[in-house]
Amino acid sequence: MYAIIETGGKQFRVEEGLELNVQKMDAEAGTKVDLDKILLIGQGEDVKIGAPYVEGAKVSCTVVEHGRDKKIVVFKKRRRKDSQTKQGHRQDYTRIKVEAIQA
């Protein structure tokens, strides 16, 4: 069974036992989180599509850890103007593990 969930403004395809990084959540490591914004649930040929979300469906997850991604460099240069800026950014994330998908 798989599901397409929405969290942090992004969509993810998840299955039971999968670990993935999502945008930072306000939950301690080791706690259980229920995600209820389920866009689609599928199992073989049987597919339920929400409008916009599937009624009564939820995905149970466990928060594994919090962390920060690799640094990206934002470099802007204006040619012939002797002007340039360099800035770094590290995005916070939460690593979750999908425990169960309930239709």
Swiss-Prot record:
Keywords: Ribonucleoprotein, Ribosomal protein, RNA-binding, rRNA-binding. One of its GO terms (biological process) is translation. Signal peptide: none annotated. GO terms for cellular component: cytoplasm; ribonucleoprotein complex; ribosome. It holds the Pfam family Ribosomal_L21p. SUPFAM superfamilies: L21p-like. One of its GO terms (molecular function) is structural constituent of ribosome. Part of the 50S ribosomal subunit. Contacts protein L20. Belongs to the bacterial ribosomal protein bL21 family. This protein binds to 23S rRNA in the presence of protein L20. This is Large ribosomal subunit protein bL21. It comes from Maridesulfovibrio salexigens (strain ATCC 14822 / DSM 2638 / NCIMB 8403 / VKM B-1763) (Desulfovibrio salexigens).
